[in-house]
Amino acid sequence: MKTLLLLVGLLLTLENGQVLGDKAVSDRELQEMSTQGSNYINKEIKNALKGVKQIKNLIEQTNEERKSLLGTLEEAKKKKEGALNDTKDSEMKLKESQGVCNETMTALWEECKPCLKQTCMKFYARVCRSGSGLVGHQLEEFLNQSSPFYFWINGDRIDSLLENDRQQTHVLDVMQDSFDRASSIMDELFQDRFFTREPQDTYYYSPFSSPHRRSSLLFNPKSRFARNIMHFPMYRHLNFNDMFQPFFDMIHQAQQAMNLHLHRLPDQLPMTEFSEGDNHDRTVCKEIRHNSTGCLKMKDQCEKCQEILSVDCSTNNPSQMQLRQELNNSLQLAEKFTKLYDELLQSYQEKMLNTSSLLKQLNEQFSWVSQLANLTQGEDQYYLQVTTVSSHNSDSEVPSGLTRVVVKLFDSYPITVTVPEVVSRNNPKFMETVAEKALQEYRQKNREE
């Protein structure tokens, strides 16, 4: 008898599988909840698309800053190249008279080489560590083949400047190629009427609007972008996926184009020998391994090497000293402009990385809407549909003091959320809380996938 009474009691409290305490939730109430939740989701979609426009504006602003910086780079490049040309001209003129003082410099060079080798190998063993034996043999050959005149005119500094110029040109070319590829995609994307409407136009999409109004707001049928994605007559119904997936695909393509080429950049920009600390040491290690020229940077630590730099040949050839002074002046100027160019290049790279970061934000901001669009294949009018509402009184598995709500976002998997019972079902905040939690879980799962 007790069992029978219990069954009767359960039957009285059940209706279509939805329960809440002693009062069943009717189909009409579930529909009202679904409508309230759908309104919240609709608002979040609008906010997401507003966010897309805001990020688009930031990308355009960053691009304007990039263009301005590029102009400054071009001016600095002209000054740098002018100084480099003057340096090479002075070097050529000096080489024509290198026989002067050759005997004095050669004698000093023979005393300079052992000190230079010892100082360099100590540095390499302490800082660079790997492959000291091979580097020592390579350095021996380099010093034997080098001339004291090359040392006297600071040939290592000239070679470093020319190599930096080559690397800087390469870095800028890579960044420009990267941006041009991404920019062509973004230009096509941002020219669509979806992005060109005024900010106050907050009407983007609603499941309750007519297909005609929806298509006229989002697409300019004359644009190439619209023609590419609208292979069907304008009067046909546009589903959510048809409208948003192409945007997402193009944003993803732009981000890939940007990142692919930025990854080709060196870990650090070329003009690092003027910097201090670990970066400088790593650069010297690299130069020593490459062709031993990094060792010449240690000439200040060897007395005989310093004496070579102090040799005065003006007695035998007054014009040579003047040429050397001109070389040193143009060399210092070239180093100054090369350093300035490198600083501007780093700023330019930061702008590029900012654009890449904004594209990533654009991707993340838009991806959940786009992924959600893949689920909107049915004719259901609700974004969010409430299927079950229960509490501890009706389901012992529900923790005390909580209301459990099972919902579906479009055709997605069921999502279960809990709401404190202090927020009653009649409270306007109830379904807002449910929808917010459901959307958070959906976004989280979408990111993990």
From Swiss-Prot:
Quaternary organization: Antiparallel disulfide-linked heterodimer of an alpha chain and a beta chain. Self-associates and forms higher oligomers. Interacts with a broad range of misfolded proteins, including APP, APOC2 and LYZ. Slightly acidic pH promotes interaction with misfolded proteins. Forms high-molecular weight oligomers upon interaction with misfolded proteins. Interacts with APOA1, LRP2, CLUAP1 and PON1. Interacts with the complement membrane attack complex. Interacts (via alpha chain) with XRCC6.
Cystine residue pairs: 101-313, 112-305, 115-302, 120-295, 128-285
Family note: Belongs to the clusterin family.
Residue numbers carrying Phosphoserine: 132, 396
Protein name: Clusterin
UniProt key word Ribosomal protein: no
Chief localisation class: secreted
One Pfam family in the UniProt entry: Clusterin
Organism field: Equus caballus
GO cellular component, one term: cytosol
Function of the protein: Functions as extracellular chaperone that prevents aggregation of non native proteins. Prevents stress-induced aggregation of blood plasma proteins. Inhibits formation of amyloid fibrils by APP, APOC2, B2M, CALCA, CSN3, SNCA and aggregation-prone LYZ variants (in vitro). Does not require ATP. Maintains partially unfolded proteins in a state appropriate for subsequent refolding by other chaperones, such as HSPA8/HSC70. Does not refold proteins by itself.
UniProt short sequence motif Nuclear localization signal, positions renumbered to this chain: 77-80, 443-447
